């Protein structure tokens, strides 16, 4: 899976991020984006890129960083989840421009975010994928 770059967005779970990075470092290139300027993330070596931001750039940071790397796919992971490598392979095998484990539907009829329907780990058509674990083809962002 060397054509996928893992981008982990850290804010308050550095121990979990460390576990994710160490699990994946032999499977694919890894980048950690630390959005917590009060708690710099240590450099781990082993080819793991660590970016310590001077301020919290919120969720948009994950998408901006996609443009800095050459791999044709980016696996975006939040700091509170640890995807199993077999899940990533299953997502990749779908060969879709974007696939995730969490999405929402019902935008057309909802009056608020709370009225949207959640879809976790199910094969469903959604209006949008919400963070968590997302595999995206870079060409879908270009």
Regions found by a protein language model. Give the residues of each.
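Short acidic donor-binding/metal-coordinating loop in glycosyltransferase active sites
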Residues: 54-55, 77-81
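Short, charged/polar "capping" segments at the starts of alpha-helices
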Residues: 14-17, 37-43, 109-111
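Glycine-rich, basic loop-to-helix element that forms the pyrophosphate-binding segment
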Residues: 53-68
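Short aromatic/hydrophobic "clamp" motif used to bind/position activated sugar donors
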Residues: 74
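Short, well-formed alpha-helical segments that are part of the catalytic scaffolds
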Residues: 8-26
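Conserved catalytic core of nucleotide-sugar-dependent glycosyltransferases
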Residues: 82-142
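Cell-envelope/extracellular polymer assembly enzymes that use nucleotide-activated donors
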Residues: 3-5, 29
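Acidic donor-binding segment of Leloir-type glycosyltransferases
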Residues: 21-52
